[in-house]
Amino acid sequence: MSTEASVSYAALILADAEQEITSEKLLAITKAAGANVDQVWADVFAKAVEGKNLKELLFSFAAAAPASGAAAGSASGAAAGGEAAAEEAAEEEAAEESDDDMGFGLFD
C-alpha cells in the first residue's frame, strides 16, 4: 500500500472515531498497521486536514454523486433522440454529395 493511502486511511479512522487528527496519531495508526510512513507525510496530512471535518467532506461528495449521475442519464437520453436526427441528416448529405463528374478527375 502506498504511503499516501496509508495516511489517508489513518486519517479516516481518526475522523470516524471523532478524534483529533495529528501527525503523532497518524503515525501510531500506520505503524500498528505495519506501514512504513515517514514523519513528513504524517505532518503534511495533519496540516491538510487541520480544522476540517472529514466526515462532512465525504458526505458532501457522496450526496453530489447521484445528482450528477441523474443529469448524465437525462443527457444520454436526449442524445439518443438527437442521434437519430443526426443520422438522417448525414444520409441526406451523402445523397447530395454524389460522385458526379465535377471536372476534378486526374485521368479525364
UniProtKB/Swiss-Prot annotation:
Residues 72-108 are annotated as: Disordered. It comes from Candida albicans (Yeast). This is Large ribosomal subunit protein P1B. GO terms for biological process: cytoplasmic translation; protein heterooligomerization; protein homooligomerization; translational elongation. Plays an important role in the elongation step of protein synthesis. PANTHER family: 60S ACIDIC RIBOSOMAL PROTEIN P1, LARGE RIBOSOMAL SUBUNIT PROTEIN P1B. The keyword Ribosomal protein applies. P1 and P2 exist as dimers at the large ribosomal subunit. The keyword Coiled coil does not apply. Phosphorylated. Keywords: Phosphoprotein, Ribonucleoprotein, Ribosomal protein. Coiled coil: none annotated. One of its GO terms (cellular component) is cytosolic large ribosomal subunit. Residues 72-84 have a biased composition (Low complexity). CDD domains: Ribosomal_P1. GO terms for molecular function: identical protein binding; protein kinase activator activity; ribonucleoprotein complex binding; structural constituent of ribosome. Signal peptide: none annotated. Belongs to the eukaryotic ribosomal protein P1/P2 family. InterPro entries: P1/P2_N_sf (IPR038716), Ribosomal_P1/P2 (IPR027534). Residues 85-102 have a biased composition (Acidic residues).
